[in-house]
From Swiss-Prot:
Major localization listed first in the record, in broad terms: membrane
Signal peptide start and end residues: 1-22
Upper classification of the organism: Bacteria, Pseudomonadati, Chlamydiota, Chlamydiia, Chlamydiales
Name listed for the protein in its UniProt record: Porin AaxA
Key word Transport present: yes
Membrane topology, from the record: Multi-pass membrane protein
Gene that this sequence comes from: aaxA
One GO term describing the cellular component: pore complex
InterPro entries listed in its UniProt record: Carb-sel_porin_OprB, OprB_sf
Family note: Belongs to the OprB family.
Amino acid sequence: MSFRSVLLTALLSLSFTTTMQAAHHHYHRYTDKLHRQNHKKDLISPKPTEQEACNTSSLSKELIPLSEQRGLLSPICDFISERPCLHGVSVRNLKQALKNSAGTQIALDWSILPQWFNPRVSHAPKLSIRDFGYSAHQTVTEATPPCWQNCFNPSAAVTIYDSSYGKGVFQISYTLVRYWRENAATAGDAMMLAGSINDYPSRQNIFSQFTFSQNFPNERVSLTIGQYSLYAIDGTLYNNDQQLGFISYALSQNPTATYSSGSLGAYLQVAPTASTSLQIGFQDAYNISGSSIKWSNLTKNRYNFHGFASWAPRCCLGSGQYSVLLYVTRQVPEQMEQTMGWSVNASQHISSKLYVFGRYSGVTGHVFPINRTYSFGMASANLFNRNPQDLFGIACAFNNVHLSASPNTKRKYETVIEGFATIGCGPYLSFAPDFQLYLYPALRPNKQSARVYSVRANLAI
């Protein structure tokens, strides 16, 4: 055995046996949402320890070890002993008691989003890929603003056990989207855009998270099985959640993504150091929409694969995260083309009040009109120390439009500039006026711009 192999083995053994002193923050959409909603500034709870304060990404470290509980009814007895209604009925007290007694965290996000847009009438049809090469009767799409979106997203995480053998965490998240009057898809057709004016352009039901995770001792390795989506890790703090940050399709998610909104599978995650994280996994290729959990698809032997690497350094300026996602999707009836995609995300706190981010993503094939995107922006949270929900953001996305993806595409590029200001009203309610400016709509050569005005009302409990 060579000296190099012995040295490498020793270093790996040392890294896996050393307890992580302060795990750095790696972005996860639903875990972050749970942490944010269960750590409001005005929660009546003991002050967190120094270890809890520096480890914001670990749910289990903030919960009472369930290995100390005895009996099936222990969580109920502990919940009663917490006496959450001693000083009156309060949502925050109930959630805190539920977390302390049963190791459960709950987040409920409900938003109402009216959007006004201009222009309102198209001048040419927006044909589907099936119409390519055929002479279709040209129709005019007309939409009457505003379009009202109602989005409800409940999430929960339950620590089932916490012992010397590791921790078991069950996590669930569901998204329900409904529209009144026009929907965003019709508005986008009328404006003749390649990208939508929000993250959910039509009525949707998405089972985005239904997983069980086994975190092994020292939290270096974890194995997750169940239904999940890569949207949870593909992004940064404010460009991956329409209910919190930017609203437009190109700035609220990866607009080139061809992976599933939620599908059954498994992934293995390894943290070689406190600031790095590696992930590899697979999913059923048939469930594209994630509207339900389809167990029978696992026997059809078609799977999507992904690899993910994240680095979350801490410097004198503040914390940051830099990640790369690679994925391959198979050809299935719901998506008639095999694709390979990538997404590179970078974010950095310049100070406690300034956060900058960027994304470069792309995909092969012609599944969606947008096949490349470059975006960057900045955000400032609680700039005036008035309310923790206060947030100001501005960003820009340059979208490369594939000419063969839609027969009506007239331009190769479409640019969106967006700015918003979230104003917190108490610990749970917020309002966010938002403005989107589209330069050179890809499907409308006779217009140089299109505009969208929005006011998002969000209740986060």
